[in-house]
């Protein structure tokens, strides 16, 4: 229990500090098609640490009758103090036609440790159920405006089609940190 939580915290910190990178690839505009055709797009990325591949990220944007479904799976094999742990993060987001968040599910699995959260945008709040092990608890967060999932920022930016020098502001929700 405690070791898995510590490994999760360490993995997320490594990503946030930039010690684990997603590698260099084509410019964002080359990864996704023009704003008129975001449907059915897929992106694979390697996750590198000190130049060594430690995992992959797979993101898929699928069209739905009333918006999109954004699926992302991240798999990493981390070696922490000589102990190798597999870490799998899986998220699905159901997005509105403007790519803002409507509802989502998220799971994190590492060994026997499991964490999950599902939620929906409802009346200016993000209403969630958080599950750790066999325990589930509710969480209600007030919203200042529409939310975007991290993996949905690139398609939303392309959809916005900004001109050079124009700023775009996106309120991002990360289910892994509930922030």
Task: Give each language-model segment a name.
Residues 49-132:
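N-terminal mature ectodomain segment of secretory-pathway/periplasmic proteins
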Residues 1-8:
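N-terminal Sec-pathway targeting helices
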Residues 8-44, 109-179:
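Solvent-exposed helix/loop surface patches that form functional interfaces
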């Amino acid at each position: 229990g405690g070791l898995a939580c510590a490994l999760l915290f360490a993995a997320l910190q490594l990503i946030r500090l930039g010690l684990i990178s997603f590698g260099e690839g084509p410019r964002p505009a080359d990864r996704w098609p023009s704003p008129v055709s975001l449907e059915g797009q897929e992106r694979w990325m390697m996750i590198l640490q000190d130049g060594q591949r430690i995992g992959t990220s797979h993101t898929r944007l699928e069209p739905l009758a009333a918006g999109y479904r954004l699926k992302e799976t991240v798999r990493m094999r981390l070696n922490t103090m000589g102990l190798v742990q597999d870490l799998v993060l899986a998220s699905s987001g159901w997005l509105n036609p403007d790519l803002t968040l409507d509802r989502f599910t998220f799971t994190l699995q590492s060994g026997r440790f499991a964490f999950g959260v599902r939620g929906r945008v409802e009346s200016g709040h993000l209403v969630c159920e958080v599950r750790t092990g066999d325990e589930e608890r509710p969480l209600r967060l007030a919203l200042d405006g529409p939310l975007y999932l991290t993996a949905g920022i690139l398609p939303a930016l392309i959809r916005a089609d900004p001109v050079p020098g124009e700023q775009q502001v996106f309120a991002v929700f990360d289910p892994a940190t509930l922030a």
